[in-house]
Every structure is written in C-alpha cells, then in structure tokens.
Design a protein with these regions (language model features):
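C-terminal flanking tails of non-heme Fe-dependent oxygenases
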Residues: 1-189
C-alpha cells in the first residue's frame, strides 16, 4: 500500500479523549454501564485506571470479561479500520509511535463491546479515539480491491458516517452494516 495514501488518510486526523466513571451499583444485574456497541473511529486506546473489571467483548454470542492488567493499554479496532483495507505501518502521533499493521476490509474486525458496573467498587477508564480527517472519503482502498477481493463496503465521507453513527440508538454491533455491500459473488459480504 502506498505510504502517501496512509498519510493522506490519517495525517492530521482527529483525536478525542473520554474519561469514564462507573459508580458502584447495589444491583449491577439491573443496569448497564455502557450499552453494547462498536467504536465509529479508526482506533481506540483504553486505559483501565483502577484495575476494576467491567469491559466485556462479545465473541461467538457470549460476553467475555476483559481482565485489566496493571499499566496496560487495550487497543480496539474501530469501524473505519474495518472499512478501509490496506497493508502498511502507520505512525500515530503519540509520545512513542505506535506501529500498527492495518489489513482490513473485514479482515480485521471492529469489536462489539460494553461496560458493566460493579456492586461494590467504582470503575475508571480513559479512552483515546483516533480517526481519519473528517473530510476524507472512507471505504476500501482502491489498490486492494480486485476481482478476487471485492469491496465489502461502500464509500462515504467520514463526516457523514460519523453523523449517521451518532444519530442512531447506541445498540448492538455497529452502524457499519449500513455501509455493507450485498454482493452474491462475494461470500464474505
């Protein structure tokens, strides 16, 4: 994949940070900290501050708790990386460069996750979201699409995708299904 394509897509991209506080709840089975969703962004980096369990991912229809490790980051691939497919090393603008090989168009998948609360202890986390420039067209990289590897997603301007994502109810996997191309010749669609 052309390095210039990566720079154009992610250089001067958007970055946001969110601090999450989940207070203790005496009846945790009756509430949810954050409903099930996948992240709209390209990449999410999460630090679970007080080592309290609460983040869960969905695998094969089952919710699996993510056990916090001291001083460790959790990296989530977001919907935009699932849509764009290319093979390259990307340097993200953090204190140290995060080299990350991105190979997607559904080869790497954004993950459905949620946060649950604890009956006795609060949970704290900080999430950093990194994404493309908002005025960029997102979709499978043209150099990756071929007769054998058909596009699984349509292209859309990043701003329109983000607007659509936030306009919907935060429920289930993702807004990504809106972009999915129904293609009978492509069994992975």
């Amino acid at each position: 994949m052309d390095e210039e394509y990566i720079r154009e897509m992610f250089g001067e991209g958007t970055q946001a940070m969110r601090m999450n506080y989940y207070p203790p709840c005496p009846q945790p089975d009756k509430v949810i900290g954050l409903t099930s969703h996948s992240d709209v962004v390209s990449l999410t980096i999460l630090l679970q501050i007080n080592q309290m369990e609460g983040l869960q991912i969905k695998k094969d229809g089952v919710w699996i708790p993510i056990i916090p490790l001291p001083h460790a980051f959790i990296i989530n691939i977001g919907d935009i990386l699932e849509v764009n497919k290319y093979d390259a090393t990307v340097a993200f603008p953090f204190k140290k460069n995060l080299n990350y090989q991105i190979v997607t168009n559904a080869a790497y998948r954004s993950i459905e996750h949620r946060a649950v609360v604890n009956s006795e202890k609060e949970r704290l986390s900080i999430a950093t979201f990194y994404s493309t420039k908002i005025d960029r067209q997102i979709g499978p990289a043209p150099s990756i699409i071929s007769a054998k590897n058909l596009a699984k997603f349509r292209s859309i301007e990043a701003a329109d995708y983000v607007r659509g994502y936030f306009a919907r109810k935060l429920d289930k996997r993702s807004y990504l299904d809106v972009m999915r191309i129904e293609n009978s010749e492509n069994p992975a669609s």
